[in-house]
A protein has these predicted regions:
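Bacterial Sec-dependent N-terminal signal peptides
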Residues: 1-21
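Phosphate-group recognition and catalysis centered on beta-loop-alpha active-site segments
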Residues: 17-255
Length: 255
């Protein structure tokens, strides 16, 4: 009997050590055209994710919109280049995308509206910076306008800036130290982890390249690990066991 009680206590200790990660909706969620209002609202309202991730591009007239690519091919408009098109013209287009056999339509979502949704549903924004005019390793001249939007919605303390552009993160950490930062990586080298420690950033890694030793190394340096993009339960549980702090997903239910 004593052995059974001890085993149960040990199991409880192990379980309590595996803290459930914070869940982030990838480009909002599966339910809707990615990176649009419907997907963001469903990520917060339907799935209950604590954070919503978006990708940022800039328009011809310097406005920040939520989209992953340089063009709108994913939404059915291959010839529409975001950097060469005004916001008004982009918003006149109907985006269409089929996901899991369901076809959705939408219009492009501004970062302003995305942040409004985050505020309304009490979730934190994860703003991924893609290479764009005025927001890239060589030129961050449009970042102040993006920061102004974050400030406008009272989300400075909650917002996470995510990007693979190291120089951009160094600019943000130097000029906007109040913002949280994550360094986006496919695979990770020791120097990446050390850089995150030195620049007070966390790290976001493709899930297949995460293991317990890597997470422990990061945590020992005060660096939290986020995993992307996780869409099955077995992978999710493996990452929980590894000790990941954040998991980005399209449609996993919160455990």
């Amino acid at each position: 009997m004593k052995k059974i009680i001890f085993a149960l206590c040990l199991l409880g200790t192990i379980t309590s050590c595996c803290k459930q990660p914070t869940m982030i909706g990838h480009r909002g969620s599966l339910l809707g055209v990615e990176n649009t209002e419907e997907a963001f609202i469903n990520g917060a309202k339907h799935f209950g994710y604590q954070g919503l991730e978006c990708d940022v591009k800039t328009t011809l007239d310097g406005q920040c919109v939520c989209w992953h690519d340089n063009n709108l091919q994913r939404g059915g408009h291959e010839n529409s280049i975001i950097a060469e098109t005004t916001l008004d013209s982009l918003q006149s287009l109907t985006l269409t995308q089929t996901r899991k056999d369901v076809t959705y339509t939408a219009t492009i979502c501004t970062v302003d509206r995305y942040l409004e949704i985050c505020k309304e549903y009490k979730v934190f924004p994860v703003v991924e910076l893609k290479w764009a005019t005025g927001i890239n390793n060589n030129d961050m001249s449009l970042f102040p306008s993006l920061y102004a939007l974050i400030e406008k919605h009272g989300l400075v303390e909650e917002a996470v800036i995510l990007t693979s552009m190291r120089q951009s993160l160094e600019y943000i950490r130097t000029n906007y130290p109040q913002l949280q930062c994550q360094y986006l990586r496919q695979t990770v080298k020791d120097e990446d982890v050390q850089w995150c420690h030195d620049w007070k950033a966390n790290i976001s890694i493709q899930h297949a390249n995460i293991n317990p030793d890597l997470v422990n190394t990061c945590n020992e340096l005060g660096v939290e690990v986020a995993a992307w993009t996780v869409n099955n339960d077995s992978t999710y549980q493996r990452l929980v066991d590894c000790g990941c702090a954040f998991v980005t997903t399209d449609y996993l239910e919160i455990k």
